[in-house]
C-alpha cells in the first residue's frame, strides 16, 4: 500500500507538508493542501475536522489518531471549553506555539503573530521525559523521523518549531509572519474590545481583530507593559555556542555525544584541555542533531589571553559586545575545544551558517537570569477586561540550555492555557490570578524528580503534573495589584539589585536582645556572670557555659573551675566549631584580651541565630544542630571522614590525627596548627609580629575585616585567598592541605605528592596560540571524552609492604562481573591470605550495585525477566516506541544494563540495548544538570558574599574610626553589621549544603565510571590481556574499593545527621 503512487494532489501536498524543512515550505504546502481540499485555513478546530474528513489518506491516519487521542481528554470538553474566547499569541517560539496548540484544542480562536519570517536557530535543547512523551503524542515522529533516536534525548530549536508549527496549522491557528507586536490599544469606548498595535501595516482583518486574552511569548527582550522583571546575577559566566555542519557520514555518526562534563566534580578533562590547547573551560556539552552543537562556559582570562576579547571591561555588555569580540579568534577557540572534546573524530569542522549567513558561533552573557515577578495580569478599560499571561523566556529566562527552558516553558504554556480555561468558565479575575500565581511559585522548583512519575498521565490539569498541589497558596487579596482597572504609566523593564542569598533567619534585632539571650543561656553556672558583650567573656567560663548548655555531654560543669582563661576559651572555640558548626570569628587570644569587641558580638550572634529557639533548661538540647550551623558542621565532618577513609585505603600516615573529632576536656589543647614559616612565599613575616591572628590573612598578609574572615584549623583567611592553587576552587576546612614545599593550599584532588615537584604545566601555559587545524590539537589522553577519571596512577606506598598487589584468576574476575555475588561453594578455593582481596572485590562490586539500589536477584527472577523481555520484543514497532516512553527507575535500569551485558541479551535485542544505553546517558545528564545548577547557585552565592563583605567593611571602618559619632548611630551601625553577619552565615550554610551534594555527585560519577571500566577489563579474554592490562585492572579495582568506602562513609554520616535532626524536632524529644 505504501508503494502505491497516489494521483490525488491533496496527498502530494500532505506529503510535502510532512517533509517540509523550511518555514516557507511548510506554509506553502499547507496552503496547497487546504486549497486542494477546499478548506479555508485558520478556522480553528472546525478546519481540523474538515481536513481530517476530506483527506482520506493512509499516511495521515496515524497522525489523526494521535491528535484525536489528545483532544479526547475530558479537560478539553470536545473542543468547547473555550468557545467564544479570542486569543492573541505573540511569538512563534517553542513555548508560544505550544501554548497556541493548547488554546486551539480548548476551542478558542487563536491568532499568532511572529516578527520573523523563518526559523534559523540550530541550538539543541535537552528534553525532559514528559516533553518527549508530550511531543510524541502530537505526532513528532511523523513530522521528524529522527526525533529522540540518538543516545541522548534532544532536538534542535528549529526542528521543534517546525513540528509545533505544523500541529498548530492543522488545528486551525491563524499565523501572521513578519508582523511585530508593539503594544496594546485599549478599547476607546464601552462595548469595544482590545486590539494590538502592530508593525508594519498589518492586514485589515488582523488590525481590527479584538481579543480578550493576550499570551506573550516574544522572548526575554520584550515584556508587555505592567509586568516587572527582576534580574538575578551571579559570578560572571561567559557562554559560547557553536554549530558545525553535520555531513551525516559514517564516521560522524560513530562519535559519541557528551551529555555534560562539569569542572565542579570532574577536573582532569579540563586540565588536559588546558595543557593541550590553552583553553580554560568550566563545562562543555556536545549534541548531535541537524548540526554538531557545542555549548561551553569559558573563563574570561582565558578569552583575553587567547585574543578572543580585545579588552577587559567591567561592564558585561561592553565586554561581550561585537566591538570587543574577535570573530576569527572566537571561531578558532570553539573549533579547538570541539575538536579536543571529540578527539578529532569529526574531521574538518565547518561552521553552520546563522540567519545572517555568518558562522554560527557566538559568545554571550550566561550571568544574568531574568524572572518576571508575576505571570499574569488583568486590565480593564470601559468595562472590557483583558487577561495577559507570560510564557517562555519573558516569564523566566533560563541560565543553561539543558532542558529547563523548554520543559518549564511547556509547563508554563499548560498553566497559561489552564488559566484561560478558568477565565472562559467565568471565574473572577482575582481568583484566576491567584491560581495562576500559585502555579507560578512551583515553576522554578520543578524537576523530573519532584513531578509526577507517570508522564503518560500529564495533561492540562495542573493536578496531573504537580504532586501536593495547592491552588490556594496565593490568596486573591495578595494579587489585587495585578488587577489594573485604571490607566497607568507604562512600567519599563527593570533590573533590581541582586540579593542572591536567602533571607537571614534569626537575625539579631539589637545588642540588648543578644545580651539578654546570652544571660539566659549562661544563668546558674558558678563563676559566670554575663553583664556585657566584652569583658564578661574574657575568662572563657561564659563561653564554656554556653557550649555546655547546648552540648551538656561534652563537659561537666565542675571541670570549668580550674581552667585557665586561654585554655577554657580555646576548648570552647574548638567544641563550638566541631560539635555545633559555629566557626570562629576571632582567636582565643583576642577573646581573652578583649581586643576585638565587634568580632565577639558577631561571633555570639551566630550562636543566637542558630539556637535562639532552644529552651534554656539544662540538658534540653539534642545532638542536632538547627539552622545554618547544621550544614557547616556536617560538611566539616564529611570532609574529615572522607579524607581519613582515603588515607586508610592508601596506607598513608594520617599525621597523628585522632579518628574522633572530640577533644578531651581534661587535656584541652591551646596549640594552633603549624603556621608557615616567614620565608615561605605566601606568608608575610608581619603576621607573627604586630597583629593578632584574626587581623591578618594567613596567606596574603592583608588586613581582615569581620565579614571577610574565614577560619580553618585555627588560622584566618580571606575567602578569595582560601582557594586551591591549581583549580581555584573554594576550599573548606578538612578538605584541603598546605604543601610543605611551596606553602600553597591545595584541594585534596590536586595536592602534589610529597617529594615530587609540582608540574607547572597543570596550570596551563601563560600564553599559547590556538591551533589552526584539528590535527594539532587532538589529545593523546583518554580514549573517550567521558572517561575523565583516568590519569596518573597512584604510586604504591613503599613503606607499606603488607599491602601487596593481588592478581585475581579469570574465574574470580568473571564472578566479580556477574550479578550473582555469592560464589559457588564447590568452586571456592580454600581460604588463604591472598584471597582477602578477592573478598574485598566482591564486597566492592556488591556495594557498588547496592549503591545504585540494585537488588541481588535470584536466577529464577533473572530468567523470568529475560522471558518477559522476549515477549516484549515480539510486539509491534509502535508498541516498542511507547514502551521506550516509560522512564525506567535509575536503579533498575542499571541492573538491567548489567544483566543484559553479562547474559548476552544485549546483543540479541538491539532495541533494548539502545533504550538502556540512552537511559544510562540520561542518568549521566541528570548528574550534569544538577552539577550545573549547583555551579550556578555557587556563583550567585560568591557574588552575594563579595557584596556583603564590601558593605561590612564600610560599616566596620565607620564603627572603628568614628569615635565621636553619637551612641545611637553606633548602635544602628552595629545592628546593620549583625544583619550582614546573619546573611553571610545563611549563605555559607547554603553553600555547605551544595558542597555536600557535590561530594555525592562526585563519588557517584566516579563509581559509575570505575564500574564501567572494571567491567571492560573483565569482559576481555584472559589470554589476550597484557601485563599492563592486568596492572591497570588491579588499579581500577583498588580505586573502586576506595570510592565504595567513601560513599559508605558519606551514607553513614547522612543517616546520623538525619536522625540527629529528627531528634531535635519538637515533639520528638523526650
Curated annotation (Swiss-Prot):
Annotated stretches, region: Disordered: 643-690, 754-838, 865-887
Entry-linked CDD domains: CH_MICAL1, LIM_Mical_like
Catalysed reactions, as listed in the record: L-methionyl-[F-actin] + NADPH + O2 + H(+) = L-methionyl-(R)-S-oxide-[F-actin] + NADP(+) + H2O; NADPH + O2 + H(+) = H2O2 + NADP(+)
A GO BP annotation: sulfur oxidation
Coiled coil: 928-1030
Protein name: [F-actin]-monooxygenase MICAL1
Bias type Pro residues, positions: 671-684
InterPro entries named in the record: bMERB_dom, CH_dom, CH_dom_sf, F-actin_Monoox_Mical, FAD-bd, FAD/NAD-bd_sf, Znf_LIM
Record note on domains: The bivalent Mical/EHBP Rab binding (bMERB) domain, mediates binding to predominantly Rab8, Rab10, Rab13 and Rab15 (in their GTP-bound forms). The C-terminal coiled coil part contains the plexin-interacting region.
Positions of modified residues (Phosphothreonine): 475
Biased composition (Basic and acidic residues): 646-665, 755-766
Chief location: cytoplasm
Annotated ranges, domain bMERB: 921-1070
Site (Important for interaction with ARHGAP26 AND ARHGAP10) location in chain: 832
Biased composition (Polar residues): 770-781
Residues binding Zn(2+) 1, per UniProt: 697, 700, 718, 721
Class of enzymatic activity (EC top level): oxidoreductase
Amino acid at each position: 500500500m505504501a508503494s502505491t503512487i497516489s494521483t490525488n494532489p491533496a496527498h502530494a501536498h500532505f506529503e510535502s507538508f510532512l517533509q517540509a524543512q523550511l518555514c516557507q515550505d511548510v506554509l506553502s504546502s499547507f496552503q496547497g493542501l487546504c486549497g486542494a481540499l477546499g478548506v479555508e485555513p485558520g478556522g480553528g478546530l472546525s478546519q481540523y475536522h474538515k481536513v481530517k474528513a476530506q483527506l482520506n489518506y493512509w499516511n495521515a491516519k496515524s497522525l489523526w489518531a494521535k491528535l484525536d487521542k489528545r483532544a479526547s481528554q475530558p479537560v478539553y470538553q470536545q473542543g468547547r471549553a473555550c468557545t467564544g474566547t479570542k486569543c492573541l499569541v505573540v511569538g512563534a517560539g517553542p513555548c508560544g506555539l505550544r501554548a497556541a496548540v493548547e488554546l486551539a484544542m480548548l476551542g478558542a480562536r487563536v491568532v499568532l503573530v511572529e516578527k520573523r519570517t523563518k526559523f534559523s536557530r540550530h541550538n539543541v535543547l535537552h528534553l525532559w521525559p514528559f516533553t518527549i512523551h508530550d511531543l510524541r503524542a502530537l505526532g513528532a515522529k511523523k513530522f521528524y523521523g529522527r526525533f529522540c533516536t540518538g543516545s541522548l534525548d534532544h532536538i534542535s530549536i528549529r526542528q521543534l518549531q517546525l513540528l509545533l508549527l505544523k500541529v498548530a496549522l492543522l488545528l486551525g491557528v491563524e499565523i501572521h509572519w513578519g508582523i511585530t507586536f508593539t503594544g496594546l490599544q485599549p478599547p476607546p469606548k464601552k462595548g469595544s474590545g482590545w486590539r494590538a498595535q502592530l508593525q508594519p501595516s498589518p492586514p485589515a482583518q488582523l488590525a481590527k481583530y479584538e481579543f480578550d486574552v493576550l499570551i506573550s511569548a516574544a522572548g526575554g527582550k520584550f515584556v508587555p507593559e505592567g509586568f516587572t522583571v527582576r534580574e538575578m546575577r551571579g559570578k560572571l559566566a561567559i557562554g559560547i555556542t557553536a554549530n558545525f555542519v553535520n555531513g551525516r557520514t559514517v564516521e560522524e555518526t560513530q562519535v559519541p555525544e557528551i551529555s555534560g562534563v562539569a569542572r565542579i566534580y570532574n577536573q582532569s578533562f579540563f586540565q588536559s584541555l588546558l595543557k593541550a590547547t590553552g583553553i580554560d573551560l568550566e563545562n562543555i556539552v556536545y549534541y548531535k542533531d541537524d548540526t554538531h552543537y557545542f555549548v561551553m562556559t569559558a573563563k574570561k582570562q582565558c578569552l583575553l589571553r587567547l585574543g578572543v576579547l580585545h579588552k577587559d571591561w567591567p561592564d558585561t555588555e561592553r565586554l561581550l559586545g561585537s566591538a570587543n569580540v574577535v570573530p576569527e579568534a572566537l571561531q578558532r577557540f570553539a573549533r579547538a575545544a570541539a575538536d579536543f572534546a571529540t578527539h578529532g573524530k569529526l574531521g574538518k569542522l565547518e561552521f553552520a551558517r546563522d540567519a545572517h549567513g555568518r558562522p554560527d558561533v557566538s559568545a554571550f552573557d550566561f550571568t544574568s537570569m531574568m524572572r518576571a515577578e508575576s505571570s499574569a495580569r488583568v486590565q480593564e478599560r470601559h468595562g472590557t477586561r483583558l487577561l495577559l499571561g507570560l510564557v517562555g523566556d519573558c516569564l523566566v529566562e533560563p541560565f543553561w540550555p539543558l532542558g529547563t527552558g523548554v520543559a518549564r516553558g511547556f509547563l508554563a504554556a499548560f498553566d497559561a492555557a489552564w488559566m484561560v480555561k478558568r477565565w472562559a468558565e467565568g471565574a473572577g479575575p482575582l481568583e484566576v490570578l491567584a491560581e495562576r500565581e500559585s502555579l507560578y511559585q512551583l515553576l522554578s522548583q520543578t524537576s523530573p524528580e519532584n513531578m509526577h512519575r507517570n508522564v503518560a498521565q500529564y495533561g492540562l490539569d495542573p493536578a496531573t503534573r504537580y504532586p501536593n498541589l495547592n491552588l490556594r497558596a496565593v490568596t486573591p487579596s495578595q494579587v489585587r495589584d495585578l488587577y489594573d482597572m485604571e490607566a497607568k504609566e507604562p512600567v519599563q523593564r527593570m533590573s533590581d539589585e541582586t540579593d542572591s542569598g536567602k533571607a537571614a533567619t534569626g537575625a539579631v534585632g539589637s545588642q540588648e536582645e543578644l545580651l539578654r539571650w546570652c544571660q539566659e543561656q549562661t544563668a546558674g553556672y558558678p563563676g559566670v556572670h554575663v553583664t556585657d558583650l566584652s569583658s564578661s567573656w574574657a575568662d572563657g567560663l561564659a563561653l564554656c557555659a554556653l557550649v555546655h548548655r547546648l552540648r551538656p555531654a561534652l563537659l561537666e560543669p565542675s571541670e570549668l573551675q580550674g581552667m585557665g582563661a586561654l585554655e577554657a576559651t580555646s576548648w570552647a572555640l574548638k567544641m563550638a566549631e566541631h560539635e555545633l558548626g559555629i566557626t570562629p570569628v576571632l582567636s582565643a587570644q583576642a577573646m581573652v584580651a578583649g581586643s576585638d569587641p565587634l568580632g565577639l558580638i558577631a561571633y555570639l550572634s551566630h550562636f543566637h541565630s542558630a539556637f535562639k529557639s532552644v529552651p534554656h533548661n539544662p540538658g534540653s538540647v539534642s545532638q542536632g544542630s538547627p539552622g545554618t550551623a547544621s550544614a557547616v558542621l556536617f560538611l566539616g565532618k564529611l570532609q574529615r571522614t572522607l579524607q581519613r577513609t582515603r588515607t586508610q585505603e592508601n596506607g598513608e600516615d594520617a599525621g597523628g590525627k585522632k579518628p574522633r573529632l572530640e577533644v578531651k576536656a581534661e587535656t584541652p589543647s591551646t596549640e594552633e596548627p603549624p603556621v608557615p614559616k616567614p620565608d615561605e612565599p605566601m606568608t608575610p613575616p608581619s603576621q607573627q609580629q604586630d597583629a593578632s591572628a584574626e587581623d591578618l590573612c594567613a596567606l596574603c598578609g592583608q588586613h581582615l575585616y569581620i565579614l571577610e574572615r574565614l577560619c580553618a584549623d585555627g588560622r584566618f583567611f580571606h575567602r578569595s585567598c582560601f582557594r586551591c592553587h591549581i583549580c581555584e576552587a573554594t576550599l573548606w576546612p578538612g578538605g584541603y592541605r598546605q604543601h610543605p614545599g611551596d606553602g600553597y593550599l591545595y584541594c585534596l584532588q590536586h595536592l602534589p605528592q610529597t617529594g615530587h615537584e609540582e608540574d607547572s604545566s597543570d596550570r596551563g601555559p601563560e600564553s599559547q596560540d590556538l591551533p589552526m587545524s584539528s590535527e594539532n590539537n587532538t589529545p593523546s589522553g583518554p580514549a573517550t571524552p567521558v572517561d575523565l577519571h583516568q590519569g596518573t596512577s597512584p604510586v604504591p606506598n613503599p613503606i607499606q609492604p603488607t599491602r601487596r598487589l593481588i592478581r585475581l584468576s579469570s574465574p574470580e574476575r568473571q564472578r566479580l562481573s556477574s550479578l550473582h555475588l555469592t560464589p559457588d561453594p564447590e568452586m571456592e578455593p580454600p581460604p588463604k591470605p591472598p584471597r582477602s582481596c578477592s573478598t574485598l572485590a566482591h564486597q566492592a562490586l556488591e556495594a557498588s550495585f547496592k549503591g545504585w539500589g540494585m537488588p541481588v536477584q535470584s536466577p529464577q527472577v533473572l530468567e523470568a525477566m529475560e522471558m518477559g523481555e522476549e515477549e516484549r520484543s515480539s510486539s509491534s514497532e509502535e508498541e516498542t516506541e511507547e514502551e521506550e516512553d516509560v522512564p525506567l527507575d535509575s536503579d533498575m535500569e542499571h541492573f538491567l544494563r548489567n544483566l543484559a551485558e553479562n547474559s548476552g541479551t544485549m546483543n540479541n535485542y538491539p532495541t533494548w540495548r539502545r533504550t538502556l544505553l540512552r537511559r544510562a546517558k540520561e542518568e549521566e545528564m541528570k548528574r550534569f544538570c544538577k552539577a550545573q545548577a549547583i555551579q550556578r547557585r555557587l556563583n550567585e552565592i560568591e557574588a552575594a558574599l563579595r557584596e556583603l563583605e564590601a558593605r561590612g567593611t564600610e560599616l566596620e571602618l565607620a564603627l572603628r574610626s568614628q569615635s565621636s559619632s553619637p551612641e545611637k548611630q553606633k548602635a544602628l551601625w552595629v545592628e546593620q553589621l549583625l544583619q550582614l553577619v546573619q546573611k553571610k552565615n545563611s549563605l555559607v550554610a547554603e553553600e555547605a549544603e551544595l558542597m555536600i551534594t557535590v561530594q555525592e555527585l562526585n563519588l557517584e560519577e566516579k563509581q559509575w565510571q570505575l564500574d564501567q571500566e572494571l567491567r571492560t577489563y573483565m569482559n576481555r579474554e584472559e589470554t589476550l590481556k597484557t601485563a599492563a592490562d592486568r596492572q591497570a585492572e588491579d588499579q581500577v579495582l583498588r580505586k573502586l574499593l576506595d570510592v565504595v568506602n567513601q560513599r559508605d562513609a558519606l551514607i553513614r554520616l547522612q543517616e546520623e545527621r538525619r536522625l540527629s535532626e529528627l531528634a531535635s524536632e519538637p515533639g520528638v524529644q523526650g
